Design a protein with these regions (language model features):
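Face-selective signature of the C-terminal outer-membrane beta-barrel domain
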Residues: 166-179, 197-272
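Hydrophobic, lipid-facing positions within transmembrane beta-strands of outer-membrane proteins
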Residues: 59-61, 81, 96-100, 109, ...
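Short acidic/polar hinge/loop motifs at secondary-structure boundaries
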Residues: 20-49
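Transmembrane beta-barrel domains of outer membrane proteins
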Residues: 4, 46, 66, 99-105, ...
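Extracytoplasmic beta-strand/coil segments of soluble accessory domains associated
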Residues: 1-22, 47
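Periplasmic-side early beta-strands and strand-to-turn transitions of outer-membrane beta-barrels
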Residues: 71-72, 79-86, 90-196
Length: 272
């Protein structure tokens, strides 16, 4: 995203309360890619000056993206079981995807699983914009049509498991996330993403006390990210065409802890 002409690291992006950054040196996996669109419950944007309570450390803006809050059974309902599923197909590029979620909840406990997958081949323009031919000189069998936009294919899979437990005044929630992107090609870049595996652990506590409210969060995210020339790009370089690609392998880790307390001093004053 871009806010007031500022983007990338000039924006602070929080996904389910986690301050995430791009593990890729070329920023091919921006923070918003860590959550599937079908899991988004709310989006808040603080443009310009950002409150300290949401980070405060950004030039352009702070963007908060959160999954839906845990659902519990109503009083006297017993157990709640619900789910949803969706799918799509797009003729251009033969794009397709599916998503599903399932929830099991009582009055004190909530368990939810989300899964999604999407993939597509190269998409096509409205008409020919180039001559048809091989994708590269060292790939004569990889044929691209005159209307085909090379290096525009992708494949992604996302899984999430959330568990929450509550009492009268307290709530504990744990989220586990797994992302697997075998490939995501870029028609406007020299390199493609040839692998992206991410694991996320997110633990949250919220409690109400006689003196006020306490919130705490601890999280850890690990990403293994790989880049190289994809199937639609020249792979062999050099004077003798003997330099194989330009592999880049990155491992990124992000660990964070946040504690926030609201102390009620009077009906008018609160100390945070």
């Amino acid at each position: 995203p871009s806010v007031h002409g500022l983007a990338d690291d000039r924006l602070r992006i929080q996904v389910d309360g986690m301050d995430l950054v791009s593990a890729c040196g070329n920023h091919m996996n921006p923070p918003l890619s860590y959550i599937d669109p079908t899991r988004v419950g709310s989006v808040r944007v603080f443009a310009g000056i950002t409150p300290v309570s949401v980070g405060g450390d950004s030039i352009g803006a702070t963007i908060q993206v959160d999954s839906p809050a845990p659902e519990f059974a109503l009083a006297g309902e017993g157990r709640r079981v619900q789910g949803q599923a969706g799918a799509f197909h797009r003729s251009n590029g033969d794009g397709m995807g599916l998503n599903l979620s399932a929830t099991y909840a009582t009055e004190q406990m909530s368990l939810r699983y989300d899964s999604s997958a999407a993939e597509a081949d190269n998409y096509k323009a409205a008409r020919d914009f180039k001559a048809a031919g091989p994708a590269a000189s060292d790939k004569p069998a990889q044929w691209l049509g005159g209307d085909e936009v090379g290096s525009s294919s992708y494949k992604t899979r996302n899984h999430s498991l959330a568990y929450a437990f509550r009492s009268d005044e307290h709530l504990v929630e744990m989220r586990l996330g797994l992302q697997d992107i075998p490939y995501q090609n870029y028609p406007n870049q020299r390199m493609d993403m040839t692998g992206n595996d991410s694991h996320q652990f997110n633990l949250r506590y919220q409690g109400q006390y006689s003196w006020g409210q306490l919130q705490a969060r601890a999280y850890h995210e690990k990403t293994r990210h790989a880049m190289n020339f994809g199937e639609d790009k020249q792979f062999l370089y050099g004077p003798a065409n003997n330099v194989p690609g330009m592999p880049m392998d990155t491992e990124g880790k992000t660990t964070g802890v946040r504690v926030k307390g609201d102390i009620t001093l009077s009906e008018r004053d609160t100390l945070r």
